[in-house]
Structures are given as C-alpha cells and as structure tokens.
Amino acid sequence: MLVTIQNAHPVGGTITAPPSKSMAHRAVLCAALAEGRSPITNLEFSKDISATLGAAAQLCARVRTGADDAVVEGLGHFVPLAAPVDCCESGSTLRFLIPIASLTGQAVTFTGRGRLMERPQSVYEALYREQGLRFEQSAAGLTVEGALTPGSYRLAGNVSSQFISGLLFALPLLAGDSTLHLIPPVESRSYIDMTRAVQAAFGVESRWQDENTLAIPGGQTYHPCDYAVEGDYSQAAFPAVLGAACGGVTITGLAPDTLQGDAAILDILRRCGARFTRTAEGISFEKAPLHGVDIDLADCPDLGPVLMVLGLLCEGTTVIRNAERLRLKESDRIAAMEAELRAVGGLVESEGGTITVQGCADRLHAPAGVLHGHNDHRVVMSLAVLSLATGIPLTVDDAEAITKSWPNFFEAIKPLGAEVEHVG
C-alpha cells in the first residue's frame, strides 16, 4: 500500500498513546496460563497481539474479544494441536511461546511470515539441544518437542530479552526451582522486569538473587485477574519526537510510573533540549531548539528508527550506540533508515551497531521518488514523523506494515496536522 503524508495544517494537537504492545503480549499469555476468566482492557488488536491471542486460543484458552478488550479464559490444561501455531511476524509471540510449548507434552510447530523464521533462535536451540530436546528450524517453520527440566540456566544478557521472558513464563510451572544466570552485560532489563511485574499480577513470583541472577520458585500457579494495559511509550515516541521538533503536541494515556524501557524517550528528548511539561492531562511539548546527543540504545532498541529522524532535526551530531539488534528486526532497520533518510538529503552513517547522524534539517529536500517502508512498521511511522516535522510531502510504500503494532496510526496523526492519502 502506498500512502502520501503531508501537512494539512501546522503541527499541533492531542494524541492518545495506544495500548502497550509489550504489556499486552505478557498479560494475554499469563491469562491463558491461569485457569479461569481474566478480562484484559485497553487492547489494540494489532497483528502482533492478534497472533498472541490466536496462539493462546490454540494452546490452552478460550478467547473472546470486544472493541478494545478481551476475556481470556484459561482452561487449566493444554489441548491437542490440530495445526501449526501461526505467529505472523511477531518475534515476541514466537519467543515467548517456545518454552511454553515444552509444557504441552506434544510436538509444537510454529510458522510465521516476513523475516520471522530468519530471526535467530540460537539461544533456545542451544538450550534445547543441551537438554536432549527436539528443536528443528527451517524457512518453513520451527518445531520443538520435549519438556524442559528445572535447574540452572545460563544465558547471555545482551541478546534479546524475549528469550529470558520466555523462560520466565514457563519455569515457574515446572516441579522444581530454577535459576537464570544472565551473563553480563544485561540489556533490556526493563523488559525482564515488565515480564515479572505482569506475572506478579497473575500470582507468579521471581526475584533478583543478585544483579545478574533470577531465582524462580517452581510449582507455582497462574491465577486469573482483571488487567488493564498501560499506554505505549514505544509508540508515543513518534508523536513525542514530532512535538519536540515542532511544539504544540500533547500526548495522553501514558502512566508516569512505568516499567516500560522506552519511557527513556522522554529523557533522551530532554537531553536534546526538548521543552515539555507533564500534568494530569498528559505530556505537552513546546517548540525548542534541539541539539545532538550521545544515545545508548541497549535498553530501548525499538526507539532506534525514530531517533535517527530526531538526529536530522537536531543541531550538531547525534551518535546512537549499541544498536546492533536493529539489524535483526522486521528489516535491517539501520540499513533501511540510512537508505530512506539519504534519499531526502540526510547525512547518516553507520558502522556495526553505531549510527552517526548529522543535523541537517535545512538541507533536506523532496526525494526523487517513492520512499520504501521495508515492510517495517517502525520505519513507516518514522518516515511519517519526518514528513510532518520538515513539511516535505513523502510517498511511502509498504504502509500497511503499521498494522503490525498500531493499525490506527494514520488516523491518529491526523489531529496533529497530518494529511494522509492512500494512493495505491
């Protein structure tokens, strides 16, 4: 799908952050593992969350959905699978479910789309092979079989925290106690603690034994509960960058006391010189001169694409470090954003996981043709921010990629001054 994005009027207005995708994944799975009825409110039925709901319904739950909520009724047991579990393009769905699949007593095959089956699963593969369990991965799908055993697990702390969270979901249900030893440095710690916090709401506990070791008692049971999903700082980063550059933007629906690692966007913007205030009504941005800073992406990799746009809008140089994982997302996000930003005159370079962006807002120009969304929701949304912040109309392909995380994105930005035309 092609869309053209441009300013209908000067940037300004109010936008409500969509529900947190990260928290919703976790709440749905905890509810599915709990015997009984768990209402989950404030849901956005993106493709990723729909994949997790669908998987829960296949494995161990009844799921009923409303306009912006769902009731997940855990059956208290796993059901025989009649078909593979389709994870669509959701890395969280796949990586969270692989250890859970070991509890089912059957072979479980996962399928996916896009680059999902190309994304590395070596952490799980090594663990499964070490325990003599089946782990077979190909472009067509991934099959696991066999029960994980309680005990001591060692994982690199600088790989995706999704592997750690996946084990956190399953290990409490084993008969014995387990420990997770994370080899430092431990990145995305906030996502690990988010998993633990959602589990705690459903009655399952773990604790940090020391800075890098999690103690997980076995023999636990998930209990149903009513769960309300917070607003999403990952998605709020897009209007936040726009507001920092242009002013006049207010974002509502974000909890001030949150475990979301991507809440770091506010500190990053503050360091860049952004001017904003937080009240009970939301976070309101005023226009202010922005300057480049040094950004560590280790704990907030999803912010990478929009921070590259931010770098163009700042005076001076922005350096983004520890961004290696961006190359293994729905696209190689570093290469994708480099290509598209250069097409409008952006000065961007990368080496490994370090990205250097030169502020050059006054040199940016209309591209020679269509920009590419690379089938990546965060690339598409970042390019929309670029268009609105600079006043340069942009036509972007693969725009349907937004349905992966924020299906209503184009409608949501219209009150901020966006005109979005579907052109093919």
What residue spans do the PLM features occupy?
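Short, structured segments at the rim of ligand-binding sites
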Residues: M1-G424
